[in-house]
Amino acid sequence: MPAVLSSVLSNITDFVVHEGNGVKGLADMGLEALPKQYVQPEEERITTSTVIVDDTIPVIDLSEWGSDPKVGDMICEAAEKWGFFQIVNHGVPLEVLEEVKAATYRFFRLPAEEKNKHCKDNSPSNNVRYGTSFTPHAEKALEWKDFLSLFYVSDEEAAALWPSACRDEALTFMRNCDAVIKRLLKSLMKGLNVTEIDGTKESLLMGSKRINMNYYPKCPNPELTVGVGRHSDVSTLTILLQDQIGGLYVRKLDSDTWVHVPPINGAIVINVGDALQILSNGRYKSIEHRVIANGSNNRISVPIFVNPRPNDIIGPLPELLESGEKAVYKNVLYSDYVKHFFRKAHDGKETVDFAKIN
């Protein structure tokens, strides 16, 4: 083993986390075996015995959205029964999707010292964060992923703080998804018999947004680790663009089995987040999902997390309780909910249970 690699492996946390090399830096050194810090417990690895190969999440064609009410019904049904679905003919130009994927690769190919300007200790703002794994300080085993997280406040702040390697493409992707997000939420609210989205509800449903750029390098011994561990998102909705490599798995509702989300060129993956599960009083389901590591290819994904504002109180919508439903969830300050999520390692649906009424 070369001396440099031996030194890195003896100080992986410094190399990967503190020096900004990320797991990409490890992979670029030509590792032949997975470092022990990334070996996941067996119960956290996905196996062929738990995967259903002949099933997958719904794919919904939005081309007739304006004229066919069945499209809205399909969206609501998918949110109830799966919590995940793919959309095609959504109106976001293919070139916008391809450009943001190219920009993601461009950022992660920057030198470590350039990326490290945006790490937790160096970034001029908490709204811009480059990092690795999920919460390295709280994890027993690290996840095989690097990320750039960009919390959107304004175009002016983005121009000043977001990395120039990907800033314009990320903003363009977000802007192009806005109309789709609003229509999806309108359909989902209609399914709850909520006919008016006033300013308060708009804040609860889409008051803030965060876009992540995720990079999963090819991995030695991918069967021993994970790209992302089991979790549900804390968002209202997540709008996910994935590349053609694949590797995203979704847990079937009320089951211990998983299904693959196959890449479809031009499609966008939509999933219900915890906030919408709580707002809908459990009608719409945020579902556990995970990403496996890949031994042959690098993989990227670009999710937009559509969230309440940090100072919003989330709880079952008044219209549902006024119709006689019993509240399943308590009212929670959204920023407290998010802090609870990020203080620990990925742990399935534990965070949404935090908001349940016992």
From Swiss-Prot:
Residues reported to bind Fe cation: 231, 233, 289
Free-text cofactor note: Binds 1 Fe(2+) ion per subunit.
Record-level GO BP terms: coumarin biosynthetic process; phenylpropanoid biosynthetic process; response to fungus; response to molecule of fungal origin
Induction notes from the record: Transiently induced by fungal (F.oxysporum f.sp. batatas O-17) and chitosan treatments, in association with the accumulation of umbelliferone and its glucoside (skimmin) in the tubers.
Record field: pH dependence: Optimum pH is 6.5.
Record's keyword annotation contains Metal-binding: yes
InterPro entries noted in UniProt: DIOX_N (IPR026992), IPNS-like_FE2OG_OXY (IPR044861), IPNS-like_sf (IPR027443), Oxoglu/Fe-dep_dioxygenase_dom (IPR005123), Plant_2OG-oxidoreductases (IPR050295)
Reactions catalysed, as given in the entry: (E)-feruloyl-CoA + 2-oxoglutarate + O2 = (E)-6-hydroxyferuloyl-CoA + succinate + CO2
Superkingdom: Eukaryota
Class of the enzyme per the UniProt entry, highest EC level: oxidoreductase
Pathway where this protein functions: Phenylpropanoid metabolism
Residues binding 2-oxoglutarate: 216, 299, 301
Keywords: Dioxygenase, Iron, Metal-binding, Oxidoreductase
Tissue specificity of this protein: Expressed at low levels in tubers, underground stems, leaves and petioles.
Domain Fe2OG dioxygenase: 200-308
Recorded GO MF terms: 2-oxoglutarate-dependent dioxygenase activity; metal ion binding
Needed co-factor(s): L-ascorbate; Fe(2+)
EC number(s) from the headed UniProt entry: 1.14.11.61
Family listed: Belongs to the iron/ascorbate-dependent oxidoreductase family.
Function: 2-oxoglutarate (OG)- and Fe(II)-dependent dioxygenase (2OGD) involved in scopoletin biosynthesis. Converts feruloyl CoA into 6'-hydroxyferuloyl CoA, and, at low efficiency, caffeoyl-CoA into 6'-hydroxycaffeate, but has no activity with p-coumaroyl-CoA.
Protein name: Feruloyl CoA ortho-hydroxylase F6H1-2
Gene that specifies this protein: F6H1-2
